[in-house]
Amino acid sequence: HFALGYLLADGGLYCILTITHQVAYPIHKYAPGLASWKERVLYGEAFGATWMTEIQGGSDLGANRTVARREGEVWRLYGGDKYFASGAGLADVALVTARPEGAPPGPKGLALFLLPRLDREGRLNYRVRRLKRKSGTRAVPSGEVELEGSEAYLIGRAEEGIYYTLETLTVSRLANAIAAMGIAAKALLETRERVRRRQSFGRFLADHPLVRYDLLDLSVRQAGGLALALAAVEAFDRAWHERPPYGEAYH
């Protein structure tokens, strides 16, 4: 996945792939009973998403107001207002944070759920209030999603939900770093091609010492950033199998 992001060098398309593959991660590790969804998102049969941010909290997940209630064989989510939901309208399934009834306040009271687009009766399982107007990553539809009685499936243990959530977000943070370095490499490639063709003061830009210096400086920065990003991916690859409470390898 990370090699793909580097070679793709497109933040919008890679975001869609990342939020899709993120769905597979906690299913594989903590919810083997939902393996059919893992196979669908990994083999291109379904798009995934991660919807956690709410309007009152932003990145403060502990402020989430979405309530999860066990009703018979399924959980239902109420009062959900996921305010910046990437993949809204596109995703077939999403990872969603919610607080089970009776759970403590704050981030440690959150559980992680799998939310299909359609419920068991084939009806739409959530409502997209509107899509955002964005200046960047416009290839990714981002919107506001309302959850009211939405069917969902619990990932792992409810009391460990915040840990699963942060693990899943780590995948996207690593993807962001790799994608940034891929985009930087693409920009350098295009720049080198341009300075070989463009002339000023009677010679090609590539022959000007200051231009050559700038390109060298940028190349070193890109190579260093890529090395750091790959080192982070390698560290995560060594420790991802750790479970809460994590050992020293994970920390």
Where are these regions (language model features)?
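Internal helix-loop-helix
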Residues: 1-39, 43-44, 86-87, 93
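Short acidic, glycine/serine/threonine-rich loops at helix termini
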Residues: 28, 59-64, 87-91, 108, ...
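Internal maturation/activation junctions in enzymes
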Residues: 31-66, 70, 233, 237-250
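Short Pro/Gly-enriched beta-strand edge/turn motifs at strand-loop
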Residues: 46-52, 76, 125-130
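Short Gly/Pro-enriched turn/cap motifs at secondary-structure boundaries
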Residues: 56-59, 84-86, 104, 134-141
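A short core secondary-structure module
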Residues: 76, 80-125
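A glycine-rich, basic-preceded beta-loop-alpha segment at the flavin cofactor/substrate interface
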Residues: 120-125, 129, 134, 141-172, ...
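Extended amphipathic alpha-helical segments enriched in small hydrophobics
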Residues: 173-242
